[in-house]
């Protein structure tokens, strides 16, 4: 569930950024680079998990599972940077807390903007720019299911960002591997969701 404080912070911050033209303009090289980094990060996470499960190469490496979670998260982070870039938005040089800022930008521009959340209406969100785009691919699903996927994608980005900080050495190896699989699944689903949305805008 989106936290009220994040919704309010996102609305305040990005209305101000839009009014003051704070965003930098991304160039084609930036777009290509962020898209490649998103794909490569997820590929690296999958590669490391495969090595961890099927070879002895990393069995004594205590940081392998941590890096799988980190690279899974970065896949999502770069995917959102790419999505924002397609909309002419690149974080300005010197932006504070880039990871939190990118998360807030994602929920503002693709979930809050154009929905009831922007007008401060109570109750559940029923429309968003992303839900309308995703509906092109999911015609058989009703709007509430669409919104569950959209809100889930924002939650994935947030929880992965938190997991990157919270992952500790207390877990057993089996528990660590289980967590890495969850991270890869989240990153894969998130990437698919964003890529579908991007593709829908080209139709």
Task: Give residue spans per PLM region.
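Terminal alpha-helical segments
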Residues: 1-203
């Amino acid at each position: 569930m989106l936290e009220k404080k994040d919704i309010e912070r996102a609305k305040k911050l990005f209305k101000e950024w839009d009014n003051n033209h704070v965003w930098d303009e991304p160039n084609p090289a930036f777009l290509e680079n962020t898209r490649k980094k998103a794909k490569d990060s997820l590929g690296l996470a999958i590669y490391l998990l495969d090595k961890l499960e099927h070879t002895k190469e990393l069995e004594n490496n205590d940081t392998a599972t941590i890096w799988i979670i980190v690279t899974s998260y970065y896949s999502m982070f770069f995917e959102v940077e790419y999505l924002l870039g397609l909309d002419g938005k690149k974080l300005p040089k010197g932006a504070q807390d880039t990871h939190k800022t990118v998360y807030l930008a994602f929920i503002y521009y693709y979930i809050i903007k154009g929905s009831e959340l922007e007008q401060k209406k109570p109750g559940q969100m029923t429309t968003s720019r992303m839900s309308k785009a995703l509906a092109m691919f999911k015609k058989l699903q009703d709007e509430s299911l669409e919104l569950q996927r959209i809100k889930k994608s924002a939650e994935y980005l947030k929880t992965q960002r938190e997991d990157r900080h919270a992952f500790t050495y207390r877990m057993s190896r089996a528990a660590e591997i289980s967590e890495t699989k969850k991270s890869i699944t989240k990153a894969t689903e998130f990437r698919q969701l964003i890529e579908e949305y991007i593709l829908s805008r080209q139709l």
